[in-house]
């Protein structure tokens, strides 16, 4: 077990041209396992069910992850207490437990710990810059106490709020990454990806990119736009992408949360492990060196990324001991037609069927078009009432 501080830092690795592999999507994975509630998507499980969070960290580590992100997504006090969410633990307890779990597992391998903050109800409700930064600072105090290796501001729909987060995180002197949940159209205020990236780098981010909301190849395209703009501005940064594990060709600016299938019927859109290998290769070719995943990414997806880039990294992940590359393990199958699939060209050419003959291949995004400052996005501590839900149901029914 490597002691804290003895490992090479994330910037040292990236500056050397190495690939850093992130982890996957904790809130979706743990919701499916029964440890996170869909709706608030908050990370109480770090304190309530540490064994579940620890095991998922461990599976991502075995799959090839170099970074264990603390399970602190939506762990700001204002989000933890939003819309009637009831807590058995304080925000500080949840953040501390998440840091301890990430460090415990990171020390089982050559992995770093990243403390993460994300967008806040305070910003959506038009609170001041000072108030929003104070919210980030409360989480940051825990990350400093627990001596995380790097900091990530992730899942921001508005570059302005992400800038505020980066400014707070940068004051620590630790490496800072910043990822927006945007596609090629830019943030929810219409700021294009390139401008977003330049602003984040000027705010102090060492690593910039995107996470969530869109599929891998869309995210690679978006980060390529960021990279071009940063270089044109004469600035320097490293680049990262942690996309969805879902196909989103029909998504608009809001991404997958605008799809009618969100969040309980997305399974037909899941990428195969072979498509993840394509993602890893395209990201690498685009000059992206921090490559991970977000919602929908399971450990086998991360293993596919690590296997695709094994030549560049110089090794295979531990979990590949139980996985034949490009299906080669199928040589051992009892059925001859399955043994015939033990080859790369079979899986690369396959176009998987959904088995749903009455379902469309594309959806129409809801397209409500609301963002910061809209009455429907003003947040509250009290539970959502039936009176508040009724007009939302009516508006949704009118669209479908």
Curated annotation (Swiss-Prot):
Organism: Danio rerio (Zebrafish)
GO molecular function list: betaine-homocysteine S-methyltransferase activity; zinc ion binding
Pfam families for the chain: S-methyl_trans
EC number of this enzyme: 2.1.1.5
GO biological process, one term: digestive system development
Cofactor comment: Binds 1 zinc ion per subunit.
Hcy-binding domain segment(s): 8-309
PROSITE patterns, sorted: HCY
SUPFAM superfamilies, per the entry: Homocysteine S-methyltransferase
Cofactor: Zn(2+)
InterPro entries: Betaine-hCys_S-MeTrfase_BHMT (IPR017226), BHMT (IPR051524), HCY_dom (IPR003726), HCY_dom_sf (IPR036589)
UniProt catalytic activity: L-homocysteine + glycine betaine = N,N-dimethylglycine + L-methionine
Protein name in UniProt: Betaine--homocysteine S-methyltransferase 1
Subcellular location: Cytoplasm
């Amino acid at each position: 077990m490597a002691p804290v501080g003895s490992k090479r830092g994330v910037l040292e690795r990236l500056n050397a041209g190495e690939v850093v592999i992130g982890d996957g999507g904790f809130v979706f994975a743990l919701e499916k396992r029964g440890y996170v509630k869909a709706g608030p998507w908050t990370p109480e499980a770090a304190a309530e069910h540490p064994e579940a969070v620890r095991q998922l960290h461990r599976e991502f580590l075995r799959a090839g992850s170099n970074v264990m992100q603390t399970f602190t997504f939506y762990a700001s006090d204002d989000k933890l207490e939003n819309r009637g969410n009831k807590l058995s633990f304080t925000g500080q307890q949840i953040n501390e437990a998440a840091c301890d779990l990430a460090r415990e597992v990171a020390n089982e391998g050559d992995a770093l710990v990243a403390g993460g903050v994300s967008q806040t109800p305070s910003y959506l409700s038009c609170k001041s810059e000072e108030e929003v930064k104070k919210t980030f600072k409360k989480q940051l105090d825990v990350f400093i106490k627990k001596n995380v290796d790097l900091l990530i501001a992730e899942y921001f729909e508005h570059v302005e709020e992400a800038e505020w987060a980066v400014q707070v995180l940068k004051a620590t002197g630790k490496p800072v990454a910043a990822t927006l949940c945007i596609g090629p159209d830019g943030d929810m205020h219409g700021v294009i990806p390139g401008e977003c990236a330049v602003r984040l780098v000027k705010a102090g981010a060492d690593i910039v990119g995107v996470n969530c909301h869109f599929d891998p190849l869309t995210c690679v395209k978006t980060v390529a736009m960021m990279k071009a703009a940063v270089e044109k501005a004469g600035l320097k940064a490293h680049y990262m992408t942690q996309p969805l594990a879902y196909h989103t060709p029909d998504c608009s600016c809001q991404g997958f949360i605008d799809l009618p299938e969100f969040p309980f019927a997305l399974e037909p859109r899941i990428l195969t492990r072979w498509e993840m290998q394509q993602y890893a290769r395209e990201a690498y070719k685009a000059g992206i060196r921090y490559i991970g995943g977000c919602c929908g990414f399971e450990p086998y997806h991360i293993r596919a990324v690590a296997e695709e880039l094994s030549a560049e990294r110089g090794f295979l992940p531990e979990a590949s001991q139980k996985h034949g590359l490009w299906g080669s393990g199928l040589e051992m199958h009892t059925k001859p037609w399955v043994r015939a699939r033990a080859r790369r060209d079979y899986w690369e050419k396959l176009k998987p069927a959904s088995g749903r003959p009455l379902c469309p291949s594309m959806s129409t995004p809801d397209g409500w078009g609301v963002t910061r400052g809209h009455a429907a996005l003003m947040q509250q501590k009290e539970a959502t009432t039936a009176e508040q839900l009724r007009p939302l149901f009516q508006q949704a029914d009118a669209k479908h």
